[in-house]
């Protein structure tokens, strides 16, 4: 799944993320990189600013360079759909911070992607926010209202799930397709009365005249929103050591959060352009997965043979069914999502 709180401040802050000079970042630069990237060439990694998130620690502290070599280029995207062209062209062998729908859209178009790291499950950091002045009291009350969302992202799936449970026909809702920064602006100008979005814009709406109507904690695990990292299957199979180093770098971010929580909150706040207090609230709204969690039944599966029954694969299938029903994608849901989930690089 996911982007900008104080727009001008954050855009400039995030643009400099790769050069943030925290003590840990300096240490990471001085460390000898692994040999994983030998013969792999220049490596591009895409990511999103999802607010307080362990992957932003890996970016800020230069763990990708430490684990994969110095010839790593980081590219910021404002949303998952915005990254699809680069993913489809093969320019990005790795991408983080994605929701399921953009990944499904890419796979449906024949892009050889696999989920290699499930970063976290949203619980309190994403959902449906309504303006207190709108008079909307329930999901059914969205009929005739303007709702902002990133069509083709996790927000499409969440809104469809909320609507189905409430018996709301989405054809009665005025859907406004916006990027997260545009969504924040539309909220401020009164163009929309409700929104389905994730942090940090989610928190902005809540603190600027919004009320949470539904959040992801109300959804079952297999229907909820995840931030996931994908690899180009062709690239990763040719360079498995690079893929393992990529996963290791992500795990380093989680470990830093677990072992240096106060410092980690400061790193995430600076990188995401938010306050430490906000970072603390946001990180509490996730169920975060470490490297050791990846190869378990609840996350990616214990092996390639069991990946199809993993929590991530089941969520992917449920997202796919919802997107197909909504007409967002025209490719029928496959019988199994096992081929699109790979726990082996986390072992």
Task: Annotate each PLM feature.
Residues 238-326:
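Secondary-structure end/capping motifs
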Residues 62, 66, 85, 89, ...:
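Solvent-exposed, polar/charged alpha-helical surfaces in well-ordered, non-transmembrane soluble domains
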Residues 101, 176, 181-272:
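Pocket-lining segment of extracytoplasmic ligand-binding domains
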């Amino acid at each position: 799944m996911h982007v900008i709180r104080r727009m001008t401040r954050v855009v400039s802050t995030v643009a400099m993320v790769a050069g943030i000079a925290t003590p840990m970042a300096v240490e990471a630069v001085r460390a000898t990189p692994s040999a994983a990237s030998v013969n792999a060439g220049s490596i591009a990694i895409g990511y999103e600013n999802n607010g307080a998130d362990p992957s932003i620690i890996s970016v800020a502290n230069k763990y990708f360079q430490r684990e994969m070599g110095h010839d790593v280029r980081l590219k910021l995207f404002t949303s998952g759909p915005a990254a699809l062209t680069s993913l489809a062209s093969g320019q990005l062998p790795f991408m983080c911070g994605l929701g399921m729908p953009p990944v499904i859209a890419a796979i449906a178009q024949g892009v050889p992607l696999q989920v290699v790291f499930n970063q976290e499950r949203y619980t309190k950091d994403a959902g449906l926010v309504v303006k207190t002045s709108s008079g909307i009291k329930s999901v059914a009350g969205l009929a005739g209202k303007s709702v902002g969302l990133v069509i083709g992202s996790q927000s499409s799936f969440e809104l469809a799930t909320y609507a189905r449970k409430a018996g709301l026909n989405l054809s009665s809702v005025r859907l406004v397709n916006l990027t997260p920064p545009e969504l924040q602006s539309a909220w401020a100008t009164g163009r929309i009365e409700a929104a389905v979005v994730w942090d940090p814009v989610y928190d902005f709406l809540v603190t600027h005249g919004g009320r949470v109507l539904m959040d992801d904690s109300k959804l079952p695990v297999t229907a909820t929103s995840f931030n996931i990292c994908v690899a180009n299957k062709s690239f990763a199979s040719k360079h498995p050591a690079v893929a393992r180093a990529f996963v290791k770098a992500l795990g380093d971010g989680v470990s830093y959060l677990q072992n240096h929580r106060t410092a980690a909150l400061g790193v995430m706040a600076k990188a995401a352009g938010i306050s430490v207090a906000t970072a603390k609230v946001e990180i509490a709204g996730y169920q975060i997965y470490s490297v050791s969690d990846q190869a378990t039944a609840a996350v990616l599966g214990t092996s390639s043979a069991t990946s199809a029954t993993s929590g991530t694969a089941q969520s992917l299938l449920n997202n796919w069914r919802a997107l197909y029903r909504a007409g967002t994608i025209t490719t029928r849901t496959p019988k199994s999502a096992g081929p699109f989930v790979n726990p082996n690089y986390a072992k």
